[in-house]
Protein backbone atom coordinates (compact mmCIF):
# COMPACT_ATOMS: atom_id res chain seq x y z
CA UNK A 1 0.00 0.00 0.00
CA UNK A 2 1.29 3.47 -0.85
CA UNK A 3 2.97 5.51 1.90
CA UNK A 4 0.98 8.54 0.77
CA UNK A 5 -2.15 8.11 -1.27
CA UNK A 6 -3.04 10.51 -4.03
CA UNK A 7 -6.30 10.01 -5.91
CA UNK A 8 -6.66 11.53 -9.37
CA UNK A 9 -9.74 11.98 -11.54
CA UNK A 10 -8.11 9.55 -13.97
CA UNK A 11 -8.01 6.89 -11.24
CA UNK A 12 -11.71 7.37 -10.53
CA UNK A 13 -12.63 7.24 -14.21
CA UNK A 14 -10.60 4.06 -14.76
CA UNK A 15 -12.31 2.38 -11.82
CA UNK A 16 -15.67 3.51 -13.21
CA UNK A 17 -14.78 1.98 -16.58
CA UNK A 18 -13.73 -1.30 -14.97
CA UNK A 19 -16.97 -1.48 -12.98
CA UNK A 20 -19.00 -0.59 -16.06
CA UNK A 21 -17.25 -2.46 -18.86
CA UNK A 22 -15.34 -5.23 -17.11
CA UNK A 23 -12.12 -6.41 -18.73
CA UNK A 24 -10.50 -9.28 -20.56
CA UNK A 25 -8.26 -10.77 -17.86
CA UNK A 26 -5.16 -12.76 -18.77
CA UNK A 27 -3.33 -14.53 -15.96
CA UNK A 28 0.27 -14.86 -17.16
CA UNK A 29 1.42 -15.92 -13.70
CA UNK A 30 -0.97 -16.60 -10.80
CA UNK A 31 -0.65 -14.52 -7.62
CA UNK A 32 1.19 -16.13 -4.72
CA UNK A 33 -2.10 -17.09 -3.05
CA UNK A 34 -3.76 -18.16 -6.31
CA UNK A 35 -6.01 -16.25 -8.69
CA UNK A 36 -9.58 -15.54 -7.57
CA UNK A 37 -11.74 -13.57 -10.05
CA UNK A 38 -13.65 -11.99 -7.16
CA UNK A 39 -10.52 -10.71 -5.44
CA UNK A 40 -10.15 -6.96 -5.80
CA UNK A 41 -7.41 -5.32 -7.82
CA UNK A 42 -5.81 -2.10 -6.59
CA UNK A 43 -4.58 0.92 -8.57
CA UNK A 44 -1.08 1.94 -7.48
CA UNK A 45 -0.74 5.44 -6.08
CA UNK A 46 -4.41 5.97 -5.26
CA UNK A 47 -4.93 2.54 -3.66
CA UNK A 48 -8.43 2.45 -5.13
CA UNK A 49 -9.73 -1.11 -4.88
CA UNK A 50 -11.94 -2.36 -7.69
CA UNK A 51 -13.73 -5.45 -8.82
CA UNK A 52 -12.71 -6.47 -12.33
CA UNK A 53 -15.57 -8.41 -13.87
CA UNK A 54 -14.33 -10.71 -16.61
CA UNK A 55 -15.98 -9.73 -19.90
CA UNK A 56 -14.99 -10.98 -23.38
CA UNK A 57 -16.45 -8.02 -25.30
CA UNK A 58 -14.66 -4.96 -23.96
CA UNK A 59 -11.76 -2.71 -24.93
CA UNK A 60 -10.18 -3.02 -21.49
CA UNK A 61 -7.55 -5.66 -20.76
CA UNK A 62 -5.83 -6.70 -17.55
CA UNK A 63 -2.57 -8.64 -17.46
CA UNK A 64 -1.90 -10.47 -14.18
CA UNK A 65 1.76 -11.18 -13.46
CA UNK A 66 1.89 -12.71 -10.01
CA UNK A 67 0.67 -10.07 -7.58
CA UNK A 68 1.25 -7.26 -10.11
CA UNK A 69 -1.36 -6.20 -12.66
CA UNK A 70 -1.31 -3.91 -15.69
CA UNK A 71 -4.35 -2.20 -17.19
CA UNK A 72 -4.67 -1.58 -20.95
CA UNK A 73 -7.15 -0.13 -23.42
CA UNK A 74 -6.72 -1.82 -26.83
CA UNK A 75 -3.03 -2.29 -26.09
CA UNK A 76 -2.42 1.21 -24.72
CA UNK A 77 -1.12 1.09 -21.15
CA UNK A 78 -3.40 2.92 -18.71
CA UNK A 79 -2.15 2.12 -15.22
CA UNK A 80 -0.28 -0.30 -13.00
CA UNK A 81 -1.69 -2.02 -9.97
CA UNK A 82 -1.65 -5.12 -7.86
CA UNK A 83 -3.90 -7.80 -6.46
CA UNK A 84 -5.39 -6.69 -3.16
CA UNK A 85 -3.26 -7.93 -0.29
CA UNK A 86 -4.27 -11.34 1.06
CA UNK A 87 -4.69 -11.94 4.79
CA UNK A 88 -2.27 -14.64 5.90
CA UNK A 89 -4.51 -15.59 8.83
CA UNK A 90 -7.27 -16.69 6.43
CA UNK A 91 -5.20 -19.74 5.46
CA UNK A 92 -5.02 -20.89 9.09
CA UNK A 93 -7.07 -23.44 10.99
CA UNK A 94 -9.72 -23.16 13.68
CA UNK A 95 -9.29 -25.11 16.92
CA UNK A 96 -11.46 -27.90 15.48
CA UNK A 97 -9.21 -28.20 12.42
CA UNK A 98 -11.58 -26.52 9.99
CA UNK A 99 -10.15 -23.78 7.73
CA UNK A 100 -10.65 -20.21 8.92
CA UNK A 101 -11.86 -19.37 5.40
CA UNK A 102 -14.75 -21.81 5.80
CA UNK A 103 -16.08 -19.79 8.73
CA UNK A 104 -15.97 -16.36 7.05
CA UNK A 105 -18.26 -16.93 4.07
CA UNK A 106 -18.40 -14.00 1.68
CA UNK A 107 -15.74 -11.97 3.48
CA UNK A 108 -13.99 -9.11 1.70
CA UNK A 109 -11.16 -6.88 2.89
CA UNK A 110 -13.06 -4.94 5.56
CA UNK A 111 -16.29 -6.93 6.01
CA UNK A 112 -16.83 -10.24 7.80
CA UNK A 113 -20.32 -11.71 7.50
CA UNK A 114 -21.76 -13.32 10.62
CA UNK A 115 -24.61 -15.59 9.51
CA UNK A 116 -27.66 -16.05 11.69
CA UNK A 117 -29.38 -17.79 8.77
CA UNK A 118 -28.12 -19.64 5.70
CA UNK A 119 -31.19 -19.27 3.52
CA UNK A 120 -33.45 -16.45 2.33
CA UNK A 121 -37.19 -17.09 2.31
CA UNK A 122 -37.59 -14.77 -0.67
CA UNK A 123 -35.33 -17.05 -2.70
CA UNK A 124 -37.27 -20.08 -1.48
CA UNK A 125 -40.57 -18.53 -2.64
CA UNK A 126 -39.37 -17.09 -5.97
CA UNK A 127 -39.33 -13.47 -4.77
CA UNK A 128 -35.59 -12.74 -4.58
CA UNK A 129 -34.27 -9.27 -5.26
CA UNK A 130 -33.73 -9.42 -9.02
CA UNK A 131 -30.04 -8.49 -8.84
CA UNK A 132 -29.18 -10.73 -5.89
CA UNK A 133 -26.84 -13.70 -6.22
CA UNK A 134 -26.29 -14.71 -2.58
CA UNK A 135 -28.69 -17.65 -2.72
CA UNK A 136 -29.21 -17.72 -6.51
CA UNK A 137 -27.52 -21.09 -6.97
CA UNK A 138 -29.18 -22.62 -3.93
CA UNK A 139 -31.83 -25.19 -4.88
CA UNK A 140 -35.19 -24.26 -3.36
CA UNK A 141 -35.44 -27.64 -1.65
CA UNK A 142 -32.03 -27.12 -0.05
CA UNK A 143 -32.95 -23.55 0.87
CA UNK A 144 -36.12 -24.62 2.63
CA UNK A 145 -34.19 -27.25 4.56
CA UNK A 146 -31.49 -24.75 5.58
CA UNK A 147 -34.19 -22.27 6.57
CA UNK A 148 -35.09 -24.59 9.45
CA UNK A 149 -31.55 -25.37 10.52
CA UNK A 150 -31.66 -26.30 14.23
CA UNK A 151 -30.66 -23.52 16.58
CA UNK A 152 -27.99 -25.85 17.99
CA UNK A 153 -26.32 -26.04 14.56
CA UNK A 154 -26.52 -22.25 14.10
CA UNK A 155 -24.89 -21.88 17.51
CA UNK A 156 -22.13 -24.33 16.56
CA UNK A 157 -21.39 -22.38 13.37
CA UNK A 158 -21.59 -19.09 15.29
CA UNK A 159 -18.81 -20.29 17.59
CA UNK A 160 -16.64 -21.00 14.54
CA UNK A 161 -17.39 -17.53 13.17
CA UNK A 162 -16.50 -15.95 16.51
CA UNK A 163 -13.21 -17.85 16.65
CA UNK A 164 -12.40 -16.66 13.11
CA UNK A 165 -13.12 -13.06 14.15
CA UNK A 166 -10.84 -13.52 17.18
CA UNK A 167 -8.05 -14.76 14.90
CA UNK A 168 -8.63 -11.82 12.55
CA UNK A 169 -8.69 -9.15 15.24
CA UNK A 170 -5.66 -10.64 17.02
CA UNK A 171 -3.85 -10.18 13.69
CA UNK A 172 -4.88 -6.52 13.64
CA UNK A 173 -7.98 -6.63 11.42
CA UNK A 174 -10.55 -3.93 12.07
CA UNK A 175 -13.67 -3.48 9.99
CA UNK A 176 -17.38 -4.27 9.88
CA UNK A 177 -19.09 -7.37 11.22
CA UNK A 178 -22.35 -7.82 9.31
CA UNK A 179 -25.06 -9.89 10.99
CA UNK A 180 -26.65 -11.33 7.86
CA UNK A 181 -28.96 -14.04 6.57
CA UNK A 182 -31.72 -12.72 4.35
CA UNK A 183 -35.40 -13.07 5.26
CA UNK A 184 -35.83 -15.83 7.82
CA UNK A 185 -38.47 -18.54 7.53
CA UNK A 186 -41.98 -17.35 8.59
CA UNK A 187 -41.87 -19.71 11.57
CA UNK A 188 -38.84 -17.82 12.93
CA UNK A 189 -39.73 -14.18 12.36
CA UNK A 190 -40.69 -13.70 15.98
CA UNK A 191 -37.31 -15.15 17.01
CA UNK A 192 -34.94 -12.81 15.17
CA UNK A 193 -33.74 -11.18 18.41
CA UNK A 194 -32.98 -14.67 19.73
CA UNK A 195 -31.02 -15.49 16.56
CA UNK A 196 -29.06 -12.25 16.87
CA UNK A 197 -28.18 -13.10 20.46
CA UNK A 198 -27.26 -16.64 19.40
CA UNK A 199 -24.52 -15.37 17.06
CA UNK A 200 -23.45 -12.42 19.21
CA UNK A 201 -22.93 -14.38 22.44
CA UNK A 202 -19.86 -16.30 21.15
CA UNK A 203 -18.37 -13.02 19.88
CA UNK A 204 -18.70 -11.46 23.32
CA UNK A 205 -17.10 -14.54 24.86
CA UNK A 206 -14.12 -14.73 22.49
CA UNK A 207 -13.37 -11.12 21.56
CA UNK A 208 -12.50 -8.54 24.22
CA UNK A 209 -14.97 -5.70 24.90
CA UNK A 210 -12.26 -3.20 23.92
CA UNK A 211 -11.87 -4.74 20.47
CA UNK A 212 -15.61 -5.20 19.94
CA UNK A 213 -16.09 -1.52 20.76
CA UNK A 214 -13.70 -0.62 17.94
CA UNK A 215 -15.59 -2.65 15.34
CA UNK A 216 -18.59 -1.58 13.31
CA UNK A 217 -21.21 -4.27 14.05
CA UNK A 218 -24.30 -3.86 11.91
CA UNK A 219 -27.62 -5.65 11.50
CA UNK A 220 -28.23 -6.46 7.84
CA UNK A 221 -31.70 -7.72 8.72
CA UNK A 222 -35.28 -7.01 7.78
CA UNK A 223 -37.00 -4.39 9.94
CA UNK A 224 -38.76 -5.86 12.96
CA UNK A 225 -42.54 -5.66 13.41
CA UNK A 226 -41.92 -3.64 16.56
CA UNK A 227 -39.11 -1.11 16.26
CA UNK A 228 -38.44 -1.48 19.99
CA UNK A 229 -36.93 -4.88 19.19
CA UNK A 230 -33.87 -2.99 17.95
CA UNK A 231 -33.13 -2.23 21.60
CA UNK A 232 -32.60 -5.98 22.08
CA UNK A 233 -30.21 -6.05 19.14
CA UNK A 234 -28.30 -3.19 20.72
CA UNK A 235 -28.17 -5.01 24.05
CA UNK A 236 -26.63 -8.01 22.25
CA UNK A 237 -23.75 -5.82 21.09
CA UNK A 238 -24.79 -4.37 17.74
CA UNK A 239 -23.95 -0.70 17.21
CA UNK A 240 -25.61 -0.15 13.84
CA UNK A 241 -28.37 -1.21 11.47
CA UNK A 242 -28.29 -1.74 7.73
CA UNK A 243 -31.80 -1.89 6.35
CA UNK A 244 -30.81 -2.07 2.68
CA UNK A 245 -33.23 -0.21 0.44
CA UNK A 246 -31.38 -1.16 -2.78
CA UNK A 247 -33.43 1.51 -4.62
CA UNK A 248 -35.21 4.64 -3.41
CA UNK A 249 -38.49 4.84 -5.37
CA UNK A 250 -41.55 2.73 -4.42
CA UNK A 251 -42.21 1.56 -7.99
CA UNK A 252 -38.64 0.38 -8.49
CA UNK A 253 -38.68 -1.19 -5.02
CA UNK A 254 -41.73 -3.30 -5.94
CA UNK A 255 -40.32 -4.32 -9.31
CA UNK A 256 -36.73 -5.07 -8.27
CA UNK A 257 -37.24 -6.24 -4.67
CA UNK A 258 -40.59 -8.10 -4.80
CA UNK A 259 -39.95 -10.09 -1.63
CA UNK A 260 -38.84 -7.10 0.40
CA UNK A 261 -41.84 -5.13 -0.86
CA UNK A 262 -44.24 -7.96 -0.05
CA UNK A 263 -42.85 -8.21 3.48
CA UNK A 264 -43.01 -4.46 4.13
CA UNK A 265 -43.69 -1.53 1.78
CA UNK A 266 -40.84 0.89 1.16
CA UNK A 267 -42.39 3.43 3.52
CA UNK A 268 -42.01 0.96 6.40
CA UNK A 269 -38.30 0.47 5.61
CA UNK A 270 -37.84 4.24 5.70
CA UNK A 271 -39.63 4.45 9.05
CA UNK A 272 -37.42 1.66 10.40
CA UNK A 273 -34.31 3.60 9.41
CA UNK A 274 -35.61 6.69 11.17
CA UNK A 275 -36.31 4.61 14.28
CA UNK A 276 -32.75 3.28 14.05
CA UNK A 277 -31.40 6.84 14.01
CA UNK A 278 -33.05 7.33 17.41
CA UNK A 279 -31.78 4.01 18.82
CA UNK A 280 -28.33 3.55 17.23
CA UNK A 281 -27.66 7.11 16.14
CA UNK A 282 -27.20 8.71 12.72
CA UNK A 283 -24.33 8.15 10.29
CA UNK A 284 -22.37 5.02 11.20
CA UNK A 285 -25.27 3.90 13.40
CA UNK A 286 -27.81 3.80 10.56
CA UNK A 287 -26.60 2.77 7.11
CA UNK A 288 -28.17 1.39 3.96
CA UNK A 289 -26.91 -0.08 0.71
CA UNK A 290 -28.31 1.52 -2.43
CA UNK A 291 -27.36 0.27 -5.88
CA UNK A 292 -26.28 2.81 -8.47
CA UNK A 293 -27.64 1.94 -11.89
CA UNK A 294 -31.02 0.41 -11.10
CA UNK A 295 -33.08 3.61 -11.32
CA UNK A 296 -32.69 6.94 -13.14
CA UNK A 297 -30.03 9.23 -11.68
CA UNK A 298 -32.41 12.03 -10.72
CA UNK A 299 -34.71 9.65 -8.84
CA UNK A 300 -31.78 8.01 -7.07
CA UNK A 301 -30.28 11.35 -6.04
CA UNK A 302 -33.60 12.64 -4.71
CA UNK A 303 -33.99 9.50 -2.61
CA UNK A 304 -30.40 9.58 -1.37
CA UNK A 305 -30.67 13.24 -0.39
CA UNK A 306 -33.90 12.63 1.50
CA UNK A 307 -32.27 9.77 3.44
CA UNK A 308 -29.17 11.79 4.28
CA UNK A 309 -31.35 14.63 5.53
CA UNK A 310 -32.74 12.17 8.11
CA UNK A 311 -29.28 11.07 9.27
CA UNK A 312 -29.13 7.83 7.27
CA UNK A 313 -25.73 7.07 5.67
CA UNK A 314 -26.25 5.45 2.24
CA UNK A 315 -23.51 3.19 0.90
CA UNK A 316 -23.65 3.42 -2.87
CA UNK A 317 -22.77 0.09 -4.46
CA UNK A 318 -22.32 0.01 -8.23
CA UNK A 319 -24.72 -2.56 -9.67
CA UNK A 320 -22.88 -5.56 -11.11
CA UNK A 321 -24.49 -8.29 -13.26
CA UNK A 322 -23.80 -11.64 -11.62
CA UNK A 323 -24.53 -15.09 -13.11
CA UNK A 324 -27.56 -16.65 -11.47
CA UNK A 325 -29.33 -13.38 -10.74
CA UNK A 326 -32.55 -12.58 -12.64
CA UNK A 327 -31.06 -9.30 -13.92
CA UNK A 328 -27.82 -10.89 -15.09
CA UNK A 329 -28.25 -9.65 -18.68
CA UNK A 330 -28.75 -6.03 -17.63
CA UNK A 331 -25.44 -4.11 -17.92
CA UNK A 332 -24.25 -1.45 -15.45
CA UNK A 333 -24.39 2.24 -16.46
CA UNK A 334 -21.49 3.63 -18.47
CA UNK A 335 -18.45 5.12 -16.77
CA UNK A 336 -19.42 8.76 -17.35
CA UNK A 337 -22.80 8.15 -15.71
CA UNK A 338 -21.11 6.52 -12.72
CA UNK A 339 -18.61 9.36 -12.32
CA UNK A 340 -21.30 12.05 -12.57
CA UNK A 341 -23.61 10.26 -10.14
CA UNK A 342 -20.75 9.59 -7.70
CA UNK A 343 -19.67 13.22 -7.73
CA UNK A 344 -23.21 14.36 -6.98
CA UNK A 345 -23.53 11.82 -4.16
CA UNK A 346 -20.18 12.97 -2.73
CA UNK A 347 -21.46 16.55 -2.75
CA UNK A 348 -24.53 15.37 -0.83
CA UNK A 349 -22.35 13.64 1.78
CA UNK A 350 -20.54 16.94 2.32
CA UNK A 351 -23.77 18.95 2.35
CA UNK A 352 -25.41 16.75 4.99
CA UNK A 353 -22.39 15.75 7.09
CA UNK A 354 -23.77 17.71 10.04
CA UNK A 355 -26.66 15.20 10.10
CA UNK A 356 -24.23 12.32 10.69
CA UNK A 357 -22.55 11.50 14.00
CA UNK A 358 -19.08 12.73 13.03
CA UNK A 359 -17.50 15.10 10.48
CA UNK A 360 -16.50 13.15 7.37
CA UNK A 361 -12.80 14.05 7.48
CA UNK A 362 -12.48 13.09 11.16
CA UNK A 363 -14.13 9.69 10.91
CA UNK A 364 -11.28 7.19 11.27
CA UNK A 365 -13.39 4.47 12.91
CA UNK A 366 -13.49 1.05 11.24
CA UNK A 367 -16.64 0.66 9.20
CA UNK A 368 -18.68 1.89 6.30
CA UNK A 369 -18.24 5.59 7.06
CA UNK A 370 -14.45 5.57 7.51
CA UNK A 371 -12.72 8.46 5.76
CA UNK A 372 -10.71 7.34 2.72
CA UNK A 373 -12.17 3.83 2.63
CA UNK A 374 -12.04 2.20 -0.82
CA UNK A 375 -14.44 -0.67 -1.32
CA UNK A 376 -14.26 -2.67 -4.52
CA UNK A 377 -17.76 -1.94 -5.84
CA UNK A 378 -18.24 1.54 -4.36
CA UNK A 379 -17.20 4.59 -6.40
CA UNK A 380 -18.97 7.40 -4.52
CA UNK A 381 -16.74 6.82 -1.47
CA UNK A 382 -13.66 7.21 -3.66
CA UNK A 383 -15.07 10.43 -5.07
CA UNK A 384 -15.71 11.69 -1.53
CA UNK A 385 -12.11 10.84 -0.58
CA UNK A 386 -10.91 12.75 -3.66
CA UNK A 387 -12.92 15.82 -2.65
CA UNK A 388 -11.61 15.70 0.94
CA UNK A 389 -8.09 15.34 -0.45
CA UNK A 390 -8.69 18.47 -2.56
CA UNK A 391 -9.71 20.26 0.66
CA UNK A 392 -6.26 19.51 2.07
CA UNK A 393 -6.87 16.35 4.09
CA UNK A 394 -4.31 13.54 3.88
CA UNK A 395 -5.89 10.22 3.06
CA UNK A 396 -5.42 7.27 5.45
CA UNK A 397 -5.14 3.66 4.30
CA UNK A 398 -7.81 2.54 1.85
CA UNK A 399 -8.51 -0.80 3.54
CA UNK A 400 -7.09 -3.04 6.30
CA UNK A 401 -3.89 -4.99 5.63
CA UNK A 402 -2.85 -7.57 8.24
From Swiss-Prot:
GO BP field: bacteriochlorophyll biosynthetic process; photosynthesis
InterPro entries, per database record: Aldolase_TIM, Elp3/MiaA/NifB-like_rSAM, rSAM
A GO term for molecular function: metal ion binding
Record key words, sorted: 4Fe-4S, Bacteriochlorophyll biosynthesis, Chlorophyll biosynthesis, Iron, Iron-sulfur, Metal-binding, Oxidoreductase, Photosynthesis, S-adenosyl-L-methionine
Recorded metabolic or biological pathway in which this protein acts: Porphyrin-containing compound metabolism; bacteriochlorophyll biosynthesis
Catalytic activity: a bacteriochlorophyllide c + 2 S-adenosyl-L-methionine + H2O = a bacteriochlorophyllide e + 2 5'-deoxyadenosine + 2 L-methionine + 2 H(+); a bacteriochlorophyllide d + 2 S-adenosyl-L-methionine + H2O = a bacteriochlorophyllide f + 2 5'-deoxyadenosine + 2 L-methionine + 2 H(+)
All copies of domain Radical SAM core, residue ranges: 104-359
Signal peptide: none
The protein's role, per its UniProt record: Involved in the biosynthesis of bacteriochlorophyll e (BChl e). Also able to catalyze the same reaction for bacteriochlorophyllide d (BChlide d) to give rise to bacteriochlorophyllide f (BChlide f).
Name assigned to this protein: Bacteriochlorophyllide c C-7(1)-hydroxylase
Lineage per the UniProt record: Bacteria, Pseudomonadati, Chlorobiota, Chlorobiia, Chlorobiales
Gene this protein is translated from: bciD
Amino acid sequence: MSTKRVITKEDIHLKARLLSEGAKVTVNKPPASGFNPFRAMVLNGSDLATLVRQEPYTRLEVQVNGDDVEFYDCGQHLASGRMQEAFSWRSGKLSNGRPVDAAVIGMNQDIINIHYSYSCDNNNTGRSCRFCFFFADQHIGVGKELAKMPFSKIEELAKEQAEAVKIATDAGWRGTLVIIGGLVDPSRRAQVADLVELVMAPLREQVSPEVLNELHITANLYPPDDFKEMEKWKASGLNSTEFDLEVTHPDYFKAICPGKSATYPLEYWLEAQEASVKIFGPGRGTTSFILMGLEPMNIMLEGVEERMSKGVYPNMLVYQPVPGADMFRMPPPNADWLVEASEKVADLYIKYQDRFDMPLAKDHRPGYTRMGRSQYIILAGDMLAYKLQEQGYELPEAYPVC
